Swiss-Prot record:
Gene3D superfamilies: 3.20.70.20. Keywords: Acetylation, Organic radical. Residues 5-127 form the Glycine radical domain. GO terms for cellular component: cytosol. The lineage of its organism: Bacteria, Pseudomonadati, Pseudomonadota, Gammaproteobacteria, Enterobacterales. NCBIfam families: spare_glycyl (TIGR04365). This is Autonomous glycyl radical cofactor. It comes from Shigella dysenteriae serotype 1 (strain Sd197). The modification N6-acetyllysine is found at residues 48, 88, 92. It comes from the Bacteria. Pfam families: Gly_radical.
Length: 127
């Protein structure tokens, strides 16, 4: 559980009036702000704070969502010949829908250049 605190009494003057997030499960403290001696976002063992007195401060904890350098995969289950035929004879494929950048799109609504690009990107000889 995460608890927000403001240190009101400490042997270390750098800790006085500083704000921290205490993680009781990990027995760690994350510095939110301190006058000196501790960097913002620095994580230390609670024992490193020493003998302190504090008051709790309200903290709203939201689930953390991080996306860093994620991958995206579009899956189109069809044959190259089907798409090539759809370029030549669009009237035969009015409902042909593919995935492009996470969106479903009718193949015939794409420009000829976009259609060629989809075919080239979807069907490669090797990775």
């Amino acid at each position: 559980m995460i608890t927000g605190i403001q240190i009101t009494k400490a042997a270390n003057d750098d800790l006085l009036n500083s704000f921290w997030l205490l993680d009781s499960e990990k027995d760690e403290a994350r510095c939110i702000v301190a006058k000196a001696g501790f960097a913002e976002d620095e994580v230390v063992a609670v024992s490193k704070l020493g003998d302190i007195e504090y008051r709790e401060v309200p903290v709203e904890v939201k689930p953390e969502v991080r996306v860093e350098g994620g991958q995206h995969l579009n899956v189109n289950v069809l044959r190259r010949e089907t798409l090539e035929d759809a370029v030549k004879h669009p009237e035969k494929y009015p409902q042909l829908t593919i995935r492009v950048s996470g969106y479903a799109v009718r193949f015939n609504s794409l420009t000829p250049e976009q259609q060629r690009d989809v075919i080239a990107r979807t069907f490669t000889e090797s990775l």
